[in-house]
Every structure is written in structure tokens, then in C-alpha cells.
């Protein structure tokens, strides 16, 4: 690693770390490495507002929204604040490649990491994927020439100041996290902020051309490179088995654009894409019984993901769709309109938003069942007819589960234990 860690300059030595999750714990580790005194402020255990005047720096975890009173209090008292990513970035000079987008961030981050590794570079993926950058830096980090591939969520991007990626890859944009950002424009501007901080090239999914027009921001800068539409690369994409889904086709098209611009040879690119293993709980078939199939897309937590799954599976027989979960301020009418455009036979509503959507059941073209919880879904499946059961819920898991992983694992267990009738 670069052994000359540079602690951020503050007027007072005490660092206030807000949040005791992964980011907060990582920031604390880095403070210890830098010999900076700190205290962790956990909202779940703090009954009173902290005394901000004592801090020289406040490091906020991503969960603190823009209108959180503690953020506002830090601003009112003129205490410098930083994201965990900025705090870590102040301690090294390594190049950073950022990856953001409504969907596809994690897949692109993992592919990009493996691509650069296969090209002979020292590389590590960090950020929103669960590997905390501050903790990595505190534990030694990469050598000065190593590259960090940093997955950046909109929560992290909105407050970035000093992290300047060498390149940024932006997959796509669709409504999400409206309850956190306040409105769609704020959500877009959080993502776009990352592009403005980028030092060299911004690689964008083709669909972002329309997005930039919608928000009237320039899309013709020399530093901005768009991937071609996936449809123009059909012959090239067909060689990769994972490219059955529209979302993955667009991801691969973006990676290809990046690789060609940086002169990574075609053989290395092809090898990387061929060996790539999709992260768990992204759209994949988890069981087949004759022509009946079961699909897990528990990570599909917004309308854009649902539409991508619908587009990928629309030709399969007798579609049964599991929809619902925790809400984030979504327009429920958008889900109704989208599902009505596809040949879905039955919609099984679950969770918090499932109850809300049940009140609009008559607006769906498909048959609607209020299953409430995942185990109940399997009680309603056809007994003498093949079907396609899809968990692509469009909403978070937090109303009934700890994570989308836990939701997906339960679904796959239910599917494994499912005993079909002789006619399925």
C-alpha cells in the first residue's frame, strides 16, 4: 500500500462517525490507523442530538438522508462533513473507477474487476458491494499502482466532494429511492454528480441518452462515451450464455465499450465475460420441472428491474409473477401499466405494497391473488398445467426480510421443496 496515509485536516481532532454499520465501523478502523480520536454515534442508541461543536469532522454513513436532522445540524454549525468514501479517498492517490446506475452496478463492478485483473492489473472492488473502502485502506490497501473499482450508490454519490474517479461507468437510470431523495430530479442529480467529479471518461449505457435529454443536461461532451444499443451487438452477444436477459446484454455492451476505449484486447474481454458468474439473486432459473420453471430475481427491487425481467421471460408459458415488498415512494400505477403490457397470467401480491396494490386489483389485466407471504404463493400454483413462476418483486425486502438475499434464499428453498402434481 501507499504507506504515507494523509489524515484529513480538521480544526479539532475529534471525528464524529454517524452510523455503526459497515461504513461506520470501517471509518472507525481508519481513524485508529490515522491515530485520530473518534466517537461513533448510533442513531438507534442515541436519545439526544450530538454536540456537533466538538467535532472537527463528521463522517456520515450512506443511510443518513439529505433532510436528516443530524446532517442539517452539522451544516448549521459549519462542521465539515464527509462521506465514508471521501474520508477514505483523502488517504491515498490510487486511481478509482466508479460504477453507478439504478440496476446492474454490482454485475458491472464484478466484471470490470475481473477484466482488469485478467489484464494484469492489481485491482479490488469496494464500495456499495459491501467491501468498505475505509476498512481496506486501514488494513493496508493496494500498492500505489493498484486500481479500486468502486460501486457507488446514489446515497453515496449525493454528498461526494473529494473522490475523483479516473473513469465512471453509469449503467442506466430509472425511478428508485424517491422517498430518500425527495423527488426524481434529486435522484438523477445525485448520480450525475459522479460524472462531474470524473477526471477522464464517463462511459454510459445507451439508454442514458434519453435520460439526459429528459433532464436537459449535456450528453455530447468529449469525456462522455455511450455504449451502442445492445440490439446492434446481437451477433457478438450471442456467444455469451448469460446474455439471455436484456439487462445483462446492456451491461456487456457497456463493458465492451470500456474495454475497447482502453485498448484491452478482445481475447481478454471474451475470456472475462465467458467466465463471469452472475451474483446470486439476479434473474436466473433456479429449478426446472419439464416445461415448468422457477426464476429468482429477488434483487429486482424497482420497476426498471421488473420490466427487464418481463422482457427476458415474456415468451415462456403461463407466467406467474410475484410482486410486492417494502415501498420507497414508487408510483404504483407504473407497475400496473407495465405488467399489463406483457402476457402475465397471474400476479401474486406479497408484502406491504402488495396490500396497496390489492386495492387496485381490478386495474390489472392478469388474475390477481393476495398471497401476503412467499410460502402462500406455492399453495395457489396450477396443478395440471405447466407454468413459469417468477420472483421479481419490484420492491425492497425490508418489510418482511433482513435483505433481498434472505428473501431469495427462502424462495429457492420453497422451490426446492415444491412437489409438483403429475400434470405440471
Task: Label the predicted regions.
Residues 1-16, 20-34, 38-43:
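Hydrophobic, well-ordered beta-alpha structural blocks that scaffold small-molecule cofactor pockets
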Residues 6, 11-14, 30, 240-344:
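Nucleotide phosphate-binding/pyrophosphate-handling subdomain across enzymes
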Residues 13-14, 25, 29-33, 47-56, ...:
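Phosphate-binding loop of NTP-binding sites
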Residues 16, 39, 124, 348, ...:
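Conserved beta-strand positions in the Rossmann-like core of class I SAM-dependent methyltransferases
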Residues 40-47, 233-240:
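Adenosine-cofactor binding site in Rossmann-like domains, unifying the SAM/SAH pocket
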Residues 41, 203-206, 320-323, 343-352:
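Short internal beta-strands
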Residues 333-388, 423:
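C-terminal helical cap/extension that packs against the catalytic core
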